[in-house]
Amino acid sequence: YVYPDNLRKEYIPPEVFAFFDRMYDLSISDSELFKGKFNLNIGECPVTLGYGGIHGAIPNFFWEETKDRGIWNEDVGSYYPHLCTINGYTSRNIPSPQIYEDILDRRMKAKAAGDKHTANALKLVCNTTYGCLLNQYNDLYDPLMGRSVCISGQLYLLELAEHCYQEIEGLRIVQLNTDGIMVECDKKDYDTLTAICAEWQSRTGFDLEEDTVVKIAQKDVNNYVEVQPDGKAKAKGGYLVKGIAPAGAFNINNSCVIVATALKEFFVNGTPVEDTINSCDDIFQFQIIAKAGAKYRDCLLYTSPSPRD
C-alpha cells in the first residue's frame, strides 16, 4: 500500500500514519494487524480508525438550528466505487477497468436524472464489487486494492474533517462515517466551509453532496434521527427504524414498533412519549416478535377492563 500523493498530510496526526505503517512490520500477524483500532478526538467528537473503516460521533447529541448556527452534512457520492476508479484501486482481475467505470458513470447519471430504479440497482453492483476485493472466494479478490480503498478512504475524510476543525473557529464535527462528515458551525463561516470542501473536491476528484440539517438527535454514529428543512425526518439504527426496510421485504423488524414511533415523534415534533403510545389504536404497533426456544417457552396473557388501563 502507498499513501495517495494528493493527500494533505499536514492535517492528519502523525500517530495515524504510525498506526497504518504497522502493516509493513512482518512480525505482526494479519489477525492481530487487522483487528487493530486507533482512537483520537476531533474536538468533542471521538473518532475510530481501523481496517474496517472510520466512524465517529458526538455521543448523546441533541441540536436544533438557530439564527446564527447551522449543520451541514457533506457526503461523498459513491465514495468507495470512485476510490476504485479515480485512484486506480479496481480489482486487477478485471480484464478492463473501463467496464466498471462505465457502470459507475451510468449509475451517477441515473441518480442525477432522478431514475431511482436504475440508480439503486447499479448501486448494489458498484458497492458489492468493493466487497469482492476482500473475499478470497470471489474471482475479483484483490486484497491490496481492497485495503487501499479502505485506508485511503479514511485518510481523505479525516483530512477534510481536521481541516474544517482547524480552520473554522467554533466548528464541531458532529459525525464522521465511511463516506462523509457532518459539521456544525456559525452560518457566517459557511463560505469558508464551502471553500475548504471545494478545494478538497478539486484535488481528490470526488464529489460532495451537501444536505442541510435543522434538527438532530444522535445517540451514536449508528443511531440517530435528523430533520431536513422540508420537515422530512431521516432515521437510522435499530432504536428508531422499524417495519419493512427500504432495502426490501426481507429486511423486516416489526417488533415493538410503537417504541420507535414514540421516540421519533418525541425527537422530531416534541410529542410526549405517553401521548403517542396512548393515542395509537394499531395493535400491530405493539406486537413483540420473539424466537421460540428455551428462553421464551410460555406466554402470559393479561386483559384489563379497558384497553387504556
Predicted feature descriptions by range:
Residues 28-32, 92, 112-116, 134-138, ...:
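Residue-level signal for secondary-structure boundary elements
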Residues 222-231:
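Short, low-order "capping/linker" segments at domain edges
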Residues 302-309:
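Conserved small/polar residues in nucleotide/adenosyl-binding loops
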Residues 84-86, 220-223:
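Short acidic, glycine/serine/threonine-rich loops at helix termini
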Residues 270-301:
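Charge-patterned, long linear interaction tracts outside catalytic cores
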Residues 44-167, 174, 184:
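Helical catalytic core of nucleic-acid polymerases
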Residues 1-82, 163-201, 206, 210-216, ...:
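Conserved "right-hand" nucleotidyltransferase catalytic core of DNA-directed polymerases
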